[in-house]
Amino acid sequence: MSGTGAQAIGLDVGGTKTAAIRVTVEGVVLARETLPTPANDMQATLDTMVQVSRSVITPEVRAIGIGAAGLVEKDTGRLTFAPNLAWRNAPLAQHLWDSLGLPTIADNDANAAAWGEFKLGAATGCRHVLFVGAGTGIGGAIIADGRLMRGAHGFAGEVGHIIVDPDGPLCGCGNHGCWEQFASGHAITRAGREAARQHPQSMIARRCGGDPAQVTGPLVTESARAGDPVARGILAAVGRSLGEGLGGLANVLDPEIVVVGGGAAAAGNLLLGPARASFVVAIEAAAHRPPVPLVTASLGNDAGAIGAAMMALEKLT
């Protein structure tokens, strides 16, 4: 559809915000809007998706694509389960199609982000890609020989819920000790709150006003950037867990490239430096095989929305 003037809206629906962008078929962002996600109210979230889409829609828009965290049925666009949100069986695609009258598709947010990076970002030109979005939790997507690997039921890529410690923290999926509890924003926040309790003189404790419940992942990251050794230690530990898991996945999948998106990328080398070091150690016989680059998503926070928009336009052809 290149050169046709066709445009699409891409939505990235997360636990805290719902972002919409309008893009050309070449991936050029023309407009954007973001609204808070009413995460505990499914109907309010569906209505927010309509509202944020209307704010960027024009007559040139031919389709809408949605990327949402959780298990999404690709054929129906229904979100069946979201471990970090109070949603079950949400008719994402159908609600927007009915409300706006435009063909709408929905997919897992990591699949959408991976597709964006594959088509227009850090993985352009690669055929075998492992994408991991490490934000509040961890989502994953696998591109094999240029195609998204979806599995028998369309739910492939839920790497954040690999159990690494059965006695570990309770996860939103209902299990204990999932990888995302050690290598994502969950881990940073949990460790930051514990540090605020155990180290009352730390920058983390001062920045939260002495109330550990006020500690967030960004607060820990900001403290680390300001030189706080406790915060830096937290990011390093989470980074090592991230890299170890990525190395294990690379052993299974043998990708050309590993792309990391989400809040982990925003933390920069304070987290990704330790991640890269443990990633190399975790790869089997790393000295005897081609190196696997571990890079950050070049589309940044737009990766999921751009990828969803590209998916929607491709569905029209």
Protein language model annotation of sequence segments:
Residues 106-108:
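Short loop/edge segments at beta-strand edges and connector loops
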Residues 33-35, 83, 152:
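Short hydrophobic alpha-helix segments
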Residues 1-63, 73-78, 93-104, 119-126, ...:
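ATP-binding/phosphotransfer module of carbohydrate and carboxylate kinases, centering on a glycine-rich
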Residues 78-88:
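A charged helix-plus-loop insertion that forms the helical arch/lid used to bind
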Residues 12, 65-69, 130-137, 141-143:
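Short beta-strand segments
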Residues 113-119, 140-142, 161-162:
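Adenylate-forming
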Residues 142-158:
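Short, charged low-complexity linear segments at domain edges
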Residues 36-38, 87, 156-158:
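A short acidic/small-residue loop/turn micro-motif
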